């Protein structure tokens, strides 16, 4: 079973819906633009998120974008202790994969990484915070997916 390591999110006004949760990569990237009142007091990430962030600087040839992505990776490494993708997460991935397949969608490519993050949340028994809730719609009833909005109520489109 995974141990939940996390950061404390400062509270501005009201208490969040959850005490803890797992942030997907979109939340980590946009963390400074999100309404922190909607985030749990303890927020953790999956090692899969670190893998996505580590690949980011290598996925562009634009030097300024490489630097921005490297900064995001370094901030995430300094801020979060990542939950490992362990045997419990691997077993949970089977359930996630089955739910996505039953919904008629494929679990391939970049989407597969999102589903590995969802499996980490399922194994940890924590809700998954994302900017792309539509990417996880087949997981209703399996993993609680929480939309992380900007202070202006904006979500990202499906990526």
Please report, for each region that a protein language model flagged, where it lies by residue:
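PIN-domain endoribonuclease scaffold, especially VapC-family toxins
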Residues: 4-21, 31-119, 137-156
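Conserved catalytic-loop position in the HRD/HxD motif
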Residues: 24
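Anion (oxyanion) recognition and catalysis
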Residues: 122
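Conserved acidic donor-binding loop of glycosyltransferase catalytic domains
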Residues: 131
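Flexible glycine-rich beta->alpha loop in the catalytic core of nucleotide-sugar glycosyltransferases
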Residues: 134
């Amino acid at each position: 079973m995974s141990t939940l390591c996390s950061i404390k999110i400062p509270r501005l006004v009201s208490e969040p819906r959850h005490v803890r949760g797992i942030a997907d990569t979109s939340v980590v990237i946009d963390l400074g633009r999100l309404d922190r009142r909607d985030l749990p007091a303890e927020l953790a990430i999956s090692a899969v998120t670190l893998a996505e962030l580590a690949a980011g600087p290598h996925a562009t040839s634009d030097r300024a974008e490489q630097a921005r992505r490297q900064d995001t990776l370094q901030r995430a490494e300094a801020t979060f202790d990542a939950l490992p993708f362990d045997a419990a997460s691997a077993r949970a991935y089977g359930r996630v994969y089955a739910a996505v397949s039953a919904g008629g969608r494929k679990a391939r490519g970049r989407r597969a990484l999102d589903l590995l993050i969802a499996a980490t949340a399922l194994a940890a028994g924590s809700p998954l915070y994302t900017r792309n809730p539509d990417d996880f719609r087949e997981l209703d009833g399996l993993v609680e997916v929480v939309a992380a909005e900007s202070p202006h109520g904006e979500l990202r489109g499906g990526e």
